[in-house]
Amino acid sequence: MRIISRSSGYASALLLAGTAALAAPAAAQASAALPGPPVVPCSSSALVAAIQQANGARFATLLLTRGCNYVLTVAAPDDGLPPITGNLVIIGSGGTTISRSSSAGNFRIFDVAGGRLALVNVTVANGNSGNQVGGGILDEGTLVLRGVRLTGNTAPSGAGLDVQNDAHATISFSELDGNNATGLAGGAIDNSADLVVDHSRVIANTAHSFGGGVFTLDPGTSRITTTVVARNVAGRTGGGIFNTTGATTVLIGDRVVFNSAGSGGGIFNGGTVQLRFTLVAFNSPDNCSPQGTIRGCLR
């Protein structure tokens, strides 16, 4: 899987810069060994401590233990992990997971609190933010997800991911599935800022009211490319995608299929939606609503 960001090459530069900074040799000798990023032991307390330390650095890269499930049991107070205020790359492998214990109280997993986070090859699971938005991740900074799975997270809105307050989020080669917005909108994603989704899957998420898959709220802009949005459910409108008045959603080379809602089973549009080489079909009870608001979409 490959990672991209809203500006070409940003995430790659981020990763390379961080690796170079952390791997600088102690002495300028060609034969000197280059130290690599630290590997975080398979312990939730170790992960918390590593992020706390990383927040104080100019840049940090953390390698997670291969195949580990970092099970979080306590919050501080709304998040299982320290809010991301620095410039941090977290890399997993072999099925690395960060999850909330099913016996723990309610808290989300990550809060990007004005910092920058690149999360690579990690599953984020079972976050529950209670009466706060963003069950899995709340993005209030810059977020890059590559090869990430957001699954089984719960929140009133933005159960998998909530993007707000002039934040930026780029998701590539990732999957958002089985997330549940219990209050209003955005089973997988609630976006009121800047969102890019590329080569990903938004599958089988639910929202109590609006946008079972992706909910884009004024003044948000969502750009979704080469992505499958399927089998999502909204209790009222916008089973796959809901785009509000003042918001913009651009879909390029996507498939929006087999979603369902009271109306706008595929897409509900109150603002601006552009379809380019995108299939919107087999949604229930209709593909797009209100009729005529999305050029190229058959009702």
Which stretches of residues belong to each language-model region?
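Sequence contexts marking disulfide-bonded cysteines in secreted/extracellular proteins
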Residues: P41-S43, A49, N55, G67-N69, ...
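Short glycine/acidic-rich loop motifs that flank beta-strands on beta-rich extracellular proteins
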Residues: S102-N106, N128-G134, T154-G160, N180-G186, ...
